[in-house]
């Protein structure tokens, strides 16, 4: 009987314990806006202003005939992607 009482007491303590806090989400804008492009092994982030602030033109290997231009510190602008037609992000 004593063991049952101890078991019930421990069980009630475990049930009353607060749940562990979830992991904090990364702050928005830490990496900056980027372009997620289709890649050979899944979606690929082509670039962002924070990671590549001086990039003027990027041609990733995963996208054929892509012309990507950055305008000042604003998000990247895709002029055209072969096979997808004209795409503008900005």
UniProtKB/Swiss-Prot annotation:
GO molecular function: neuropeptide hormone activity
GO CC annotation terms, alphabetical: extracellular region
Signal sequence region: 1-16
Coiled coil: none
Keywords, sorted A to Z: Amidation, Neuropeptide, Secreted, Signal
Residue numbers of Isoleucine amide PTMs: 89
GO biological-process terms attached to the record: neuropeptide signaling pathway
Localization, UniProt: Secreted
Listed name of the protein: Neuropeptide-like 3
Originating species: Drosophila melanogaster
Gene: Nplp3
């Amino acid at each position: 009987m004593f063991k049952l009482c101890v078991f019930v007491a421990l069980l009630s303590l475990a049930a009353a314990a607060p749940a562990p806090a979830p992991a904090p989400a990364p702050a928005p804008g830490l990496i900056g806006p980027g372009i997620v492009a289709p890649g050979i092994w899944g979606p690929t982030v082509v670039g962002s202003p924070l990671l590549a602030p001086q990039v003027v033109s990027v041609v990733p290997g995963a996208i054929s005939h892509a012309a990507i231009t950055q305008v000042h510190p604003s998000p990247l602008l895709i002029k055209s992607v072969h096979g997808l037609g004209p795409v503008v992000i900005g």
